[in-house]
């Protein structure tokens, strides 16, 4: 058994080998490997399946009580400075290994069909394998230095995959935006790592927390400096997990292929930030101010993402802001000390969001032949509608993911989100109020997406007035039905259900979306009063107060407010965007007749639409204040450098040149001239002395 645990590094090694093999093939045998393009996906999927099976084995060993395993290779670089490379296998690691590998396998199977006709098919699988290997290496890392190495690899792979279609200007700009934004966070992360090494003398996670606690107990730590280091370190997860104010890269990342959007938003890049905060949780707990910053950052991010998602027209960007909001929930949970709830929501959200993104990919794939291949058309929900009758399996799986994300029992996210809502309310009512309000907004915008995409009539052939169509407001049919459009009967193209290869991952991901939440159900046995997930995670950190665990019926009773507000959001979405039943039409006509109400609704809807369209004006503020401000500052610096600094230097040179040119005529080689000049100067000197 010990020999098996010593080979945990095989888990990231297999996808890394797949990436290396495909990369070598593309570099040395580009023409030959393109003839066997299907073989490249088979290699990637097969190697990742091996890694997934190993991950399940290690996960099973951990939940059955096996001890935590650490294995390190050490190098003494300079005197007492030792660099250790290895792995750490504990319950948190084992859960993340299973999460990353299972989602990545489903994404790769899906990509085999989705990307089959793309010229970069093999390159895509090469990048995808490297991306997965980087994330697996990150979760296995036992220290901050190794985390930072794989952290940068994850960032590099995201840059390559977001800009995969780099010939499209929007994709090229999006990958640069993601890269630059994450550089800000990575710089802070590096400062935090170096700062904590200065304090504790260690990069190792276990030693770091232990030494920090000892120094804190003996009052040998400057708390201001330690807090500053923790905030710098937290800046890395803020950027990587798209937290306010470094969230601006996430919606632009939708320019990449849809399968990579699913992987980024479910189990890799954005999960890396949450994972690092969870790994550093024992240390952050000793700094209350930092925990407060984490919780408020999460709450603001959750609310901001939900409000921006309210009126998005782009299907993928709506889901992207949903991811931002749910990541805010996770960060909020970790900030209030609810370690288990935050990680539980990371797990449940990953499967639900992977299902939603892959479902959106199937929708986009079927819409492209009808409306065009540009994202402004194929991803625009205004051109969708009524897809349930053409894509029933995709619609059902998408509905399951939507119900889960809304927090409707018994779907997965209900159990994790409700625990976050209750714990945040008990911790601080204002945070709880923000969390509950955001839950209602989540239900509204998710069902808005579902209704606009799958319900009603198909709008893909309404091309008479594209501009008016694209300006659909938050109030849906209240204003949308005022416009009359004619069907282009010449067109015979209609959406089609995705093929079996693309449907298989959707059906498989539906299983954890429905059932994985049950691992967090609280139950009351004679020998245990905790849930399964808490029991597993307790092996690595005892951060959950079991005395506050509720019985199952009490838990369901406390869930009534969250479920009620979710249903309220769904009802509003149904009223505004749902199928137009006869009684709803009458109510909407009555509402439109009341001019005062109509004016209020229009003004409010315009505000929400502009808030969503301009992304809460944050991108515009960054563009005006930072980009334009920096360019203006550069112009000033350039002017000073060119005309003042260079002017002084060049002026001295010019003055010396002309001075030399003038004085050279004085020197003529005649002694009488020199004598006359000396006498004349002496005369002037004596005359000046006499006058003075």
From Swiss-Prot:
Membrane spanning residue stretches: 9-29, 39-59, 89-109, 120-140, 147-167, 184-204, 219-239, 258-278, 289-309, 327-347, 354-374, 395-415, 425-445, 503-523, 555-575, 643-663, 671-691
Keywords: Chloroplast, Membrane, NAD, NADP, Plastid, Plastoquinone, Quinone, Thylakoid, Translocase, Transmembrane, Transmembrane helix, Transport
Function: NDH shuttles electrons from NAD(P)H:plastoquinone, via FMN and iron-sulfur (Fe-S) centers, to quinones in the photosynthetic chain and possibly in a chloroplast respiratory chain. The immediate electron acceptor for the enzyme in this species is believed to be plastoquinone. Couples the redox reaction to proton translocation, and thus conserves the redox energy in a proton gradient.
Membrane topology label: Multi-pass membrane protein
Compartments reported by the entry: Plastid, Chloroplast thylakoid membrane
Name of protein: NAD(P)H-quinone oxidoreductase subunit 5, chloroplastic
Quaternary structure and interacting proteins, as annotated: NDH is composed of at least 16 different subunits, 5 of which are encoded in the nucleus.
Keyword NAD: yes
Enzyme Commission number(s) of this protein: 7.1.1.-
Gene behind the chain: ndhF
Enzyme class: translocase
Any Gene Ontology biological process: ATP synthesis coupled electron transport
Any GO MF annotation of the entry: quinone binding
GO cellular component: chloroplast thylakoid membrane
InterPro entries: NADH_UbQ_OxRdtase_chlpt_su5_C, NADHpl_OxRdtase_5_subgr, ND/Mrp_TM, NU5C-like, Proton_antipo_N
Catalytic activity: a plastoquinone + NADH + (n+1) H(+)(in) = a plastoquinol + NAD(+) + n H(+)(out); a plastoquinone + NADPH + (n+1) H(+)(in) = a plastoquinol + NADP(+) + n H(+)(out)
S-S bridge residues: none
Family under the similarity heading: Belongs to the complex I subunit 5 family.
